[in-house]
């Protein structure tokens, strides 16, 4: 059984930028993997961490002599544990995976601004709406690249978590978007279908988090930022 140690920035940040690694490890497609998760506060990393990982980046994977940073690099590395023919990357190819990572990045920045800051603007809301529209047009269906689950799905889907909360933030920034969450979300019908499908994947169900949990985490982060600014 392979052993690996994964260092992640924060328990809840795994839901945002490293949940894809958790889902990959528990996908059932790979052989059983044991791994230790060490959760770090990105604003107060312990002194030993830079000695282990000079870049001090998260997420970070330590496996035997391998030290890897960046979620895309870690995902591709872990994906090969069962062999190239069985890899999820082979289902989408490098091009499809890069496309998914680029879309995920385009969602991540405005999503973060809307959720975790008090200075989000209508421009941030528009950027997220444009990113979701691009995703809606790109999904081949039923999965991101077609008929089978691929590494591309695990790259993009974590950024569609806490959906109703994020849609609510959009409404706050742009009241012309619709009267309620359902109205604004209806702009992206393929994304909605995709979310329903992916939410039923065993690896997602096993690692899913409740919307209330995410909201509490957002409140904690916003309150800490406000306190630090005093």
Residue spans of the language-model regions?
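GST-like domain detector, emphasizing the conserved glutathione-binding G-site
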Residues: 1-145, 225, 230
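GST-like fold's C-terminal all-alpha helical module
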Residues: 100-200
């Amino acid at each position: 059984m392979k052993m690996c140690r994964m260092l992640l920035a924060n328990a809840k940040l795994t839901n945002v930028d490293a949940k894809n690694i958790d889902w990959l490890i528990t996908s059932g497609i790979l052989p059983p993997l044991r791994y230790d998760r060490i959760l770090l506060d990105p604003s107060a990393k312990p002194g030993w961490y830079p000695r282990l990982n000079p870049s001090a980046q998260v997420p970070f994977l330590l496996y035997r002599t391998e030290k890897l940073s960046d979620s895309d690099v870690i995902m591709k590395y872990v994906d090969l544990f069962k062999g190239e023919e069985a890899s999820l990357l082979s289902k989408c190819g490098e091009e499809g995976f890069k496309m998914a990572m680029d879309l995920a990045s385009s969602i991540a920045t405005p999503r973060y601004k809307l959720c975790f800051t008090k200075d989000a603007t209508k421009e941030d809301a528009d950027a997220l709406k444009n990113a979701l529209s691009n995703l809606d047009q790109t999904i081949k269906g039923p999965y991101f690249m077609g008929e089978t689950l691929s590494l591309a799905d695990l790259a993009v889907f974590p950024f569609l978590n806490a959906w109703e909360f994020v849609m609510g933030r959009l409404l706050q920034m742009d009241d012309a978007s619709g009267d309620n969450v359902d109205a604004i979300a209806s702009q992206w019908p393929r994304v909605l279908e995709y979310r329903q499908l992916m939410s039923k994947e065993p690896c997602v169900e096993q690692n899913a988090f409740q919307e209330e949990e995410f909201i509490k985490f957002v409140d904690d982060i916003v309150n800490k930022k406000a306190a630090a600014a005093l």
